[in-house]
């Protein structure tokens, strides 16, 4: 079967050329696989479990792209033999029809549904050799997708996956760079100056605290507060007083007051957990990609509004996160007139849309994918012969869309994503990233032993009908097992559950927090907790 013009079949190619090309591809593939393996080993060595899982999901995405490529290769010839009418083939084209001679409109239209064959046959590149005879032309019809268009679609999917992974890594890198500024604020919490300034026996009027002064006043006016929140995300999205107040509220709600808890390291762990979600192209995002390709026909400007929507969503999310901080400050002001010690907010899901903090992550994941789609589409159309003339008739407009997408990516990575990592900790529940591997293993062992003891108690019930019931042994408590695992700063016995989290989950309810009089008397901690955490360090240790 004859190949395309200017090309040769494999039987007409020298064996040394085939061997050289094959060897280069194999060496590059093995080198990439070895590099990913080394990276995974480094994550395991330094106990970066979340990043290791993110790497595994990245490998899964590359495998998915490989499966798609394989399907495109296998089904290329059968799909190119599927014929449709010319009327159907000329509807919803991404570019204006033109005639081959003058480049203007005409009846001799060239189909450009994600493909153009270019000026001459020398531009054609196929995954497999095309059929020698156009079956559909004999029937007066056109092919559903030609071999050339399927090849270009295959290239675009690969470029999209690469840019999504690249944008995810950039987002994680810039977010951690921004969060490094918060580390010095976390270090100040261990100083005597901070402990003296936030002495539990010290009282202040609520309206005199820095947090209330920053977020109330003119900012509390309805309508104006949204404008203030919108502009605040660009200049002072997170200040020192915001960080310290949210930190204190998290500790009071989920731990016990006075703990030396490394809140900054906890946020970093939570961010790594979220990175596992961001780096993956979920089924919902693939559906969004298919929807954009479906709507990308001439006349509605899909690519234009697609470059604007991510920026609008990011600004909306950033404004909402700033509003959450302002609403918590307003609640402190309305709840009590005198603050004892450090002012602390009360975490709750009620501050977020539909009581779902995880929806914020989905919106950011969506905008990240849309930005990657836009950049991948730009690179793909510019690098593919014929498509540049189709999609970039006004190159200045195309460059403006790319600049807008890059600005949205920087805004997401350096401002919105770190703000999300901090503010979403103010939900009703802690993230599981607070537990390390040793603690999780101890909990698993306790669960296994609890099942075994339950079976033993069920068997003893038959023997205890005439006598007393069985008495649980000393080792049936998870705290007992975790004590054997070693006194660590992030063990569950050092991390009592939040009263709000237990109330919402149907667990044991605790009385509401009360502010004692400012006479130097301090509320005593639970004796059960003091027995396990006298002066414990709640910092997470990722290196051993």
From Swiss-Prot:
Q: Where are the bilayer-spanning segments?
A: 16-36, 60-80, 155-175, 285-305, 306-326, 360-380, 403-423
Record InterPro entries: Mlo (IPR004326)
Coiled-coil residues: none
Cytoplasmic topology ranges: 37-59, 176-284, 327-359, 424-544
Q: Where in the cell is it found?
A: Membrane
One cellular component term (GO) for this entry is:
membrane
Please list where the region (Disordered) is annotated. 485-544
- Molecular functions per Gene Ontology: calmodulin binding
**Looking at the record's lineage, which domain of life comes first?**
Eukaryota
Its primary localisation, in coarse terms, equals membrane
Region of interest: Calmodulin-binding = 437-458
The residues exposed to the Extracellular compartment are 1-15, 81-154, 381-402
Record GO biological process: defense response
Topology in the lipid bilayer: Multi-pass membrane protein
For the keyword Transferase, the answer is: no
Q: Which UniProt keywords apply?
A: Calmodulin-binding, Membrane, Pathogenesis-related protein, Plant defense, Transmembrane, Transmembrane helix
Q: What is known of its domains?
A: The C-terminus contains a calmodulin-binding domain, which binds calmodulin in a calcium-dependent fashion.
Similarity-based family: Belongs to the MLO family.
> Function, please?
May be involved in modulation of pathogen defense and leaf cell death. Activity seems to be regulated by Ca(2+)-dependent calmodulin binding and seems not to require heterotrimeric G proteins.
- Protein name per Swiss-Prot or TrEMBL: MLO protein homolog 1
Q: Which organism is it from?
A: Hordeum vulgare (Barley)
